[in-house]
Curated annotation (Swiss-Prot):
A lipid is attached at residue 1082 (S-farnesyl cysteine). GO terms for biological process: glucose homeostasis; glycogen metabolic process; positive regulation of glycogen catabolic process. This is Phosphorylase b kinase regulatory subunit beta. Pathway: Glycan biosynthesis; glycogen metabolism.
Length: 1085
């Protein structure tokens, strides 16, 4: 690449000619002591006019990506920074009374650009509507437009347009600029469009995108990833725009933007889970700087901020700027400019010669100003100064990047940092890098104290740590401060007779009629009200998508069409899924919801939590647990959360009230109908009957002879006859399942269609607590639990993968968030291979795991892949161990709350008291690995030219080591993929132990390496053979193929498994060549 345009135009001879621009020599020349404010601002005004505004399109207001050669393309995020640069200088000119019209000019240059982007976006309103319903790379807003016409450029196949960070940055700067007094939004069409952009951004936590660098994963192969920088910018934008009036001081109630607090909170949790990583393939990335610092200031946790920033600086900072990320091939001489995507392992070529970008020194300068760290400002200003160049007029220019010329590449790789780098003065990237120019203006205005941080951050995205407790924030970025929140609780009984019954136990409740005129709504009615938010027929926008309202949303009071409305949380909905019939699970959900509200409630005013008590909750054995919970409410503390129980009318004064004024209904429009929660009416003096809900003895068992194996081959007539005679619900479900598969759901039985008959059996079995029958019926009806997709997302954002499918059968790996419909199809396709009940119990586990991993992530340490089928296998194994010599309890007969407790039991890492066979079986089923396991496999691979083999799966040394880095998430997943072929949990755990042994042996013997493939199966076989020889010699036991005794042997100690594994590993290594060392004392000469 020595003859590349970049190299040619960077030569000293050409720089001296002045035809492009020269190194900046005058930047440190002393200015007059008596320089006036006008002179200072005039200096920057001329820079802005000459290096930025002269390139702004006179028609759209957009800025081109390149400033030479008639460039047609304009990228949204670059134009946004240009607008911000002009706006920042306008803010400085506000300090001068007679500004000669410059404030107006600069402000309206920014407004023109912002409205230009809005114009481009609004022409794609159909894409917003599609993306809102189905977020995919082929339904998103474009990120590149024609600079002169605003037309969309480049198809989805030609360019990765899915860049949520661009939309988020637009919303963030929109709020900041309007807050400073600019008028950008003109009418209600634009307000409704912005509201719909918010709907799109709310779901960022589950939408992998291409990121700031437009490349997706680090491998640049067209795949998308969940990026911390995108999620962080979305979080910041949502916090800034929540409750914001787009008309500024002249606004009214219907120009206010609404944000779903629960969706925002999921973005917050996702961001904290991903950091300090940027994504699965990016261990760190300079794109995190604008996320954690200016302009987003997305982090509330100071420790996490420091950890993330330190990692960026440590790994990416150089003499000429920051690398974007490690092994970034962008504009390096070894990158092929004619290919959009890289080949496998190609990124290894760019290791150590990544371009360095001075723009990130500017971000660090701005960060220093905001944090009052003058040393940081000076440090990065001193680093930046020698990198700046100047135009022929003498104005400073920030080069886009500095690169290593082709002739110097080998020397740079041998000795990093030794070679001179050259700036990207022109060539493919144009004369000026406008993003850098804009940020230079902002940084210098701040450093010279011509504007203050409060000027360019009027909504106070950045708040110093010492002020965070006292600042009136917009609900959510006050951070994880310790709080002593008291949750207000109102107890509502569904009928008057239930109220009287509870009163006899000293539990004071209210009925829906007694709280009037306040109405009690299920959250689904609130969702219906929100359908009207952002609706716009002219633009073809339908308003808020059908998404449930979470615990934070239902903890507010709403004013809707003159009514005062409170909502009970979704956990009290009468779900179609059987888990809601387990009252112990309901109590657990209530405690979890209260703890969640305590942790994440950041609003002024107290949360209002409605507890809805139904008559069905207190029947039979359900009564005592419910009574204990209500007594805990009365005492004022439940699950570690302080609560205050009172009448709803009393609590309403301290709550947060949300005015839903977007429900503007004209006289000609029909009022939307909302159904409030109705009180159950019963005859006077009737009493609540606490009838038993325990299973009748005959119902609990199958009728003799009714098995799927026997009856699936009998005629339909025979099955119908047996169905009519069968009084056992379990038998009926089996027979109905056979009919369903054979004849279809609409086949007529004595009790209507097959599907209706199964539904009735499902209800009856639920009331009798016949959980195995309930699960089979639920599976036959293809029922799906609520919150399935969010639960899987909770697992994914913790850096894990989820696999669905039965143990020993094909599994589906989920790496990115999916829609509920897709997850349902996977579950019912993969899980019903050998037992119909598997599909629904896997859903139960997904819900439980989603909750547990959010609240106790340490229980999943060492588990990179959450294999649901294998976890079920571990639970069944645990039941066998507990049963001893007796028949094991059937997992499917346990209640959902018992299943959850069993899951928690096996997840506990301390398994002391168990035999080693049981430990290995459980840990293998959970896919648990020791600390630093994947790093050690990397080190093994470095010393194994032909790779590693296990269970027929080969992990090659190349291109693995070339394509990846040691600490990369994708390498760990590759190792998991290799181990995924092992079909026995305890054997998998022995393989994990073997890999740790191999790593330690290689670490202590640097002169050794494997000459051939490391066949792990062969090594275990040889170790077991050695173990058998010792067993037969010492204990006089005949050799057996059964490895149970080996699995049950402790790893350490005399004749532990590690002793045998170490022996065979050393034998294998010593069969190869020993590499001599200069320090080897065995050498004679």
């Amino acid at each position: 690449m020595a003859n590349s345009p970049d190299a040619a135009f960077s030569s000293p001879a050409l720089l001296r000619s002045g035809s492009v621009y020269e190194p900046l020599k005058s930047i440190n020349l002393p200015r007059p002591d008596n320089e006036t404010l006008w002179d200072k601002l005039d200096h920057y005004y001329r820079i802005v006019k000459s290096t930025m505004l002269m390139y702004q399109s006179p028609t759209t207001g957009l800025f081109p990506t390149k400033t030479c050669g008639g460039e047609e393309k304009s990228k949204v995020h670059e134009s946004l920074y240009c607008a911000a640069g002009a706006w920042a200088l306008a803010l400085a000119y506000r300090r001068i009374d007679d500004d000669k019209g410059r404030t107006h000019e600069l402000e309206h240059s920014a407004i023109k650009c912002m409205r230009g982007i809005l114009y481009c976006y609004m022409r794609q309103a159909d894409k917003v509507q599609q993306f809102k319903q189905d977020p995919r790379p082929t339904t998103c807003l474009h990120s590149v437009f024609s600079v002169h016409t605003g037309d969309e450029l480049l198809s989805y196949e030609e360019y990765g347009h899915l860049q949520i960070n661009a939309v988020s940055l637009f919303l963030l700067y929109l709020v900041e600029m309007i807050s400073s007094g600019l008028q950008i939004i003109y009418n209600t069409d634009e307000v409704s469009f912005i509201q719909n952009l918010v709907f799109c951004v709310e779901r960022v936590y589950r939408v992998p995108d291409f990121g700031v660098w437009e490349r997706g994963s680090k491998y640049n192969n067209g795949s998308t990833e969940l990026h911390s920088s995108s999620v962080g910018l979305a979080k910041a934008a949502l916090e800034a725009i929540n409750g914001f009036n787009l008309f500024g001081n002249q606004g009214c109630s219907w120009s206010v933007i609404f944000v779903d607090l629960d969706a925002h909170n999921r973005n917050r949790q996702t961001l904290c889970s991903l950091l300090p990583r940027e994504s699965r393939s990016h261990n760190t990335d300079a794109a995190l700087l604008p996320c954690i610092s200016y302009p987003a200031f997305a982090l509330d946790d100071e420790a996490l901020f420091s950890q993330t920033l330190d990692k960026v600086i440590r790994k990416l900072k150089g003499k000429y700027g920051f690398k974007r990320f490690l092994r970034d091939g962008y504009r390096t001489p070894l990158e092929d400019p004619n290919r959009r995507y890289y080949k496998p392992a190609e990124i290894k070529l760019f290791d150590g010669i990544e371009c360095e970008f001075p723009i990130f020194f500017l971000y660090m300068m701005i960060d220093g100003v905001f944090r009052g760290n003058l040393e940081q400002v000076k440090e990065y200003q001193d680093l930046l100064t020698p990198l700046l160049h100047q135009t022929t007029e003498g104005y400073p220019v920030v080069p886009k990047y500095y690169y290593v010329p082709a002739d110097f590449v080998e020397c740079e790789k041998r000795n990093p940092g030794s070679q001179k780098r050259f700036p990207s003065n022109c060539g493919r990237d144009g004369k000026l890098f406008l993003w850098g120019q804009a940020l230079y203006i902002i940084a210098k205005l701040l450093a010279d104290e011509l504007i203050s941080p409060k000027d360019i951050d009027p909504v106070q995205r950045f708040v110093p740590l010492q002020n965070q407790r006292n600042v009136s924030m917009r609900y959510s970025n006050q951070g994880p401060l310790e709080n002593d929140l008291v949750v207000h609780v109102a107890l509502v009984a569904e009928s008057q007779r239930l109220q009287v019954f509870l009163n006899t136990y000293g539990i004071q409740t209210q009925t829906p009629q007694q709280v009037e005129p306040i109405q009690i709504w299920p959250q689904q009615e609130l969702v219906k009200a929100y359908f009207h938010l952002g609706i716009n027929e002219k633009l073809g926008l339908s308003g808020r998508p059908d998404r449930p309202i979470g615990c934070l949303g239902t903890s507010k009071i709403y004013r809707i069409l003159g009514k005062t409305v409170v909502c009970y949380p979704i956990i009290f909905d009468l779900s179609d899924f059987y888990m809601s019939q387990d009252v112990l699970l309901l109590i657990d959900d209530i405690k979890n919801a209260l703890q969640f509200i305590k942790q994440y409630w950041k609003m002024h005013g107290r949360p209002l939590f409605l507890v809805l008590i139904r008559e069905d909750n207190i029947r039979g054995s359900r009564f005592n647990p419910i009574l204990d919970m209500l007594a805990a409410f009365k005492k004022g503390i439940i699950g570690g959360v302080k609560v205050h129980v009172d009448r709803l009318q009393t609590l309403i004064s301290g709550a947060v009230v949300e005015q839903l004024d977007f429900l503007r209904i004209s006289d000609t429009e029909k009022l939307p109908e909302f159904k409030s929660f109705e009180e159950l009416e019963f005859p006077k003096h009737s009493k609540v009957k606490r009838q038993s809900s325990t299973a009748d003895a005959p119902e609990a068992q199958h009728e003799p002879g009714i098995t799927i194996t026997e009856w699936k081959n009998k005629s339909t007539h025979e099955i119908l006859q047996k169905l009519n005679d069968c009084g056992c619900l379990a038998g009926q479900t089996i027979l109905l399942g056979i009919l369903l598969k054979r004849e279809g759901p609409n086949f007529i039985t004595m009790e209507g269609t097959v599907s209706d008959h199964i539904e009735r059996v499902y209800r009856r079995a639920g009331s009798k607590k016949l959980w195995s029958v309930v699960r089979r019926a639920a599976s036959l009806l293809n029922k799906v639990v609520d919150s399935l997709a969010p639960s899987i997302t909770n697992v994914l954002v913790q850096g894990k993968q989820v696999t669905l499918g039965a143990f020993g059968h094909e599994e589906e790996v989920i790496s990115n968030p999916l829609s509920p419909r897709v997850i349902k199809n996977i579950i019912y396709y993969k899980c019903n291979t050998h037992d119909e009940r598997e599909a629904v119990i896997q859903q139960e586990l997904v819900i439980h795991i989603g909750w547990i991993i959010s609240n106790s992530p340490e229980l999943f340490s060492g588990m990179l892949k959450i294999r649901i089928g294998w976890i079920i296998h571990a639970m069944e194994y645990e039941l066998q161990v507990r049963g001893g010599d007796k028949p094991a309890v059937d997992l499917y007969q346990l209640s959902p709350s018992e299943v959850k407790q069993l899951l928690l039991d096996i997840l506990q890492p301390q398994q002391s008291g168990r035999c080693w066979l049981n430990r290995r079986q459980i840990d293998g089923s959970l896919n648990r690995t020791p600390p630093e396991f994947y790093d050690r496999v990397w080190q093994i691979l470095e010393r194994t030219p032909n790779g590693i083999v296990v269970a027929g799966k080969h992990l090659p040394q190349q291109p693995t080591l070339s394509d990846m880095t040691m600490y990369e998430m994708n390498f760990s997943l590759l190792v998991e993929d290799m181990l995924g072929n092992i079909d026995q949990p305890k054997y998998r755990q022995i393989i994990v132990e073997l890999l740790m042994v191999v790593s330690i042996v290689l670490e202590r013997n640097p002169e050794l390496e494997f000459q051939d493939k490391v066949d792990l199966d062969r090594l275990v076989k040889e170790a077991f053979h050695e173990f058998q020889k010792d067993e037969s010699r010492l204990k006089e036991i005949e050799k057996q193929d059964d490895m149970t005794s080996f699995y049950n042997t402790p790893p350490l100690g005399k004749r532990g498994t590690c002793s045998y594994l170490t022996k065979v590993v050393m034998n294998s290594l010593l069969e190869g060549e020993v590499k001599p060392s200069n320090e080897d004392s065995c050498l004679v000469s």
